[in-house]
């Protein structure tokens, strides 16, 4: 038995969408600052290795791997709104906690907690963005959400580099302020769960959930690994090839991802999710390959733009595909499981690819994800031949 909770998607106006956009952009501007500040802090202040840098950066995603399925299930039971608000307060406290992290293990611990609470907020945002969108516009809704994310990523790393140059404490303080602002904005967001599932209502097993999202999830895992390598190793990569600050490369990546998200969601809604994801993975892998072989200071810029374009096409399309296979009352749980595949790719990238880069050379930090993206491309091709599955 279930009880009605709120009105259908049509009842949520543009104001709800705008408040969500502002909260997401503010939160991810803070996370973008950390993308450049944390690797420099571990490398320059704490003397960490490339593997340590990768671990400190991507442990964020390891925590998310465990958190998202639980959060998704809870959102289907008690609602979305609590998961849009209180995690932002905790993130503000954890940002200040970075100032007290004077060893690599302490940074890793803070990043682990940031991953748990940050992924809680993001999972809620992803579910809410599809709650308030008509079914035929789901990819566009996910693309708009990720557009707000990349507004933060476009400027955050540049700001992080700027602030870190003036003192390692300034990035953490700026992040705390941004998280608190996002918390204030989130108070304006309504509950969007249409029908609460009660404790005695049947729910799909984890095996059935994994069967539904396995192939799109594996394809997204391959993209997630490459994305994590971009954010984890770009500060050291830019210095190794003689560019100095990574801010310009981060900005190029984020701007290319922003640009493609303006229309990738609409293309996926119109022509099909797989039709956008397949070429996206190809371009994504090619960009990593070019970064791995770049011998000039100009080639990394078009190469990293290709990775941004590829990821910007892949993520909204595959996310919408997962949502499309889920009944409304189980959307949170399905999205939680799907996003965990992305988190798994993110989590293994830092320590595994970082160790390879330490042993074989920094260029393998992008050579490995190029190979993995090729595998993801093959998996995505298989989605064209597989029939749609759903939990219903």
Model region roles, listed by residue range:
Residues 89-102, 283-295:
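C-terminal ends and interior cores of transmembrane alpha-helices
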Residues 176-195, 379-384:
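C-terminal membrane-cytosol helix-exit motif in multi-pass small-molecule transporters
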Residues 112-148:
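Cytoplasmic helix-loop-helix junction between adjacent transmembrane helices
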Residues 145-187:
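Helix-loop-helix hairpin linking two adjacent transmembrane segments in secondary transporters
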Residues 105-113, 287, 298-306:
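Paired small-residue
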Residues 61-69, 153-154, 257-258, 262, ...:
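Residue-level signature of mid-helix packing/kink "hotspots" within the transmembrane helices
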Residues 66-101, 268-271:
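Conserved MFS/SLC helix-loop-helix module at the cytosolic interface between two early adjacent transmembrane helices
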Residues 47, 79, 100-105, 272, ...:
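Helix-breaking motifs and short loop linkers at transmembrane-helix boundaries and internal kinks
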